[in-house]
Amino acid sequence: MADRFKRGMTSPVRLLVRALPTRTSRIVGALLAATASALCVIPGFNVLNYYSGLAIAVVGGLLVGLTNASDPIQPTRARLRTIILGRLAQALFLACIPLVILLLNAFRVTNCDLMAGLSFYAVGPLATILIASQWGLAARLLGQTRQRSILAFLGLWLAWIGSDVISFLTEPPIFAYNAFVGFFSGAVYDDLIRIDPPLLFFRLGNLVQLGLLLAVVSPLFVAHRAAIELSRLRTVRPLQWAVAGVAVLCVGTLTGAAGYLGYDIDRETIQAQLGGTLSNDQIVLFYDQSTITPEEAALILEDQTFRLHQLQPHGRGTGCGPT
């Protein structure tokens, strides 16, 4: 009986060791479990929804990316595709740890819409963790050493998030899309947060970016050294150049259309979409010319100018130019 019990306990342990073969990956698994457990006692985050998904995406994307950047790639005869699939499988296992904990917590806290929560988890933390694992792997391939690889991934992570923070602070939109975070809604009310086409287009763009990275790195990968060698550029076949060219074209197309697809909107994009402009010496009004006539826009501009004068002492301008 004791032997049977030991064998029963050994099987899950072996599964865990196979799924998370390195010490770093097991530590990350424990940290993700701790994060999900902490969320289980925080109101609003203790169910499977947008908010818990956002928290797990931030933590999971960073940790899994760092894991893949720090874990060495063993020199083998395996193709790069096999290594990528192995890292994806590991990332998928790690992403499932918080999911299982939050699903179990549903026995304690009622989920309003479990299917919506699963959908948010799929396009949020699950996609983020899988994508971060590949950028971490790319950092390891290019950095070669553990220290350089970690610094490369951290630099990419900080630059990507920093760019979105700057855009968030300087441009009109109050939302942001990020490969390592997912979707920051900016909305206060749950009813306004939904999975819409811009988020799906954004995730498609993430996949295309990774496709370009793979198309460039794959021909340069040397399996027996587990390294990238630029000297292999001379041996790249025309078909491989063509695949890389198509990937560049796809990335360029999606990047150029990002504003119109709705996931990278700036002031110029909004002005172009609205179409109508009216101004005086104090206010520049941009309006939707498909729903507002020029006469109505003139009345709005007049009213806003009057309100601005009410806010200013003695009706004088601020000296800061048009608002």
List the predicted regions and their residue ranges.
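Membrane-embedded alpha-helical segments of integral membrane proteins
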Residues: 159-228
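Secretory targeting signals
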Residues: 86-146
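Helix-loop-helix units of permease transmembrane domains in multi-pass membrane transporters
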Residues: 56-96, 100
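Juxtamembrane "helix-exit" motif on the non-cytosolic side of transmembrane helices
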Residues: 35-46, 100-113, 162-171
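Central hydrophobic cores of alpha-helical transmembrane segments
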Residues: 147-161, 242-247
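Internal/C-terminal transmembrane anchor helices
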Residues: 230-262
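Hydrophobic alpha-helical transmembrane segments
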Residues: 1-69
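Juxtacatalytic substrate-recognition/specificity segment
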Residues: 270-323
